[in-house]
Amino acid sequence: MKYCHHCASPLVQRVPEGDDKLRYCCDSCDTIFYQNPKNVVGTLPVQGDRVLLCKRAIQPRLGKWTLPAGFMENGESSLDGAIRETLEEAGALIKVQKDSLYTLFNLPAINQVYMFFRAEIINLDATPGFETEEIGLFAESEIPWDEIAFPVVRSTLEHYFQDLPRKRFPVRMFDVHHGEDRSITTHVISHSHHEY
């Protein structure tokens, strides 16, 4: 990359403030160009019957609640990325079982794949990162359902609380389709039957 896609100024390579990776940056309009795989990975961290959610301090969906998740970095596995994002966004140390993949969402309209892994919270004493305004542990009845940031997060939470009484957490894979009115529908394309 040589020029900014937004203002056509020359790009420079540097490590942006608050980052630890070399990025293409535009010093004219302050745009940072992230060259990441289009895989979003995160966890569904639990402590007892409560789920850890993060209130977003950044766009998109500023002020809305989400599971800790973000883009994978080059050179890391999906599980390693999910664990990293959970520590960065929620300040939580977690334990993840080897068969912990829980939901996978294909979003062909935006060329992204979202993966969420079930995780047990080991330590919640760390400070959340700059992308998170606050964190909270919520039982099902306490979740701010109308303030959930993304449909894939809502779907993951709904399935988790549906599965929790049976202690069976099958892996579910979905195709997500965007309608002309910006509505989103999911279609289950795979459903495993593992007991944990």
What are these regions (language model features)?
Residues M1-T43:
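Acidic, metal-coordinating catalytic segment for phosphate/diphosphate chemistry
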Residues K2-H6, A92, G179:
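Small, basic N-terminal interaction modules of short regulatory proteins
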Residues Y3, R23, L44, L53, ...:
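Conserved hydrophobic/aromatic beta-strand scaffold that supports enzyme active sites
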Residues Q13, L53, D99-T103:
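A short linear hydrophobic-aromatic micro-motif
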Residues K21, K38-V40, V46, P60-L62, ...:
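Short connector loops at helix/strand junctions that flank enzyme active sites
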Residues V46-E88:
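Conserved Nudix-box catalytic region and its N-terminal flanking loop in Nudix hydrolases
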Residues M173-E180:
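Short, highly charged C-terminal tails/helix-capping segments
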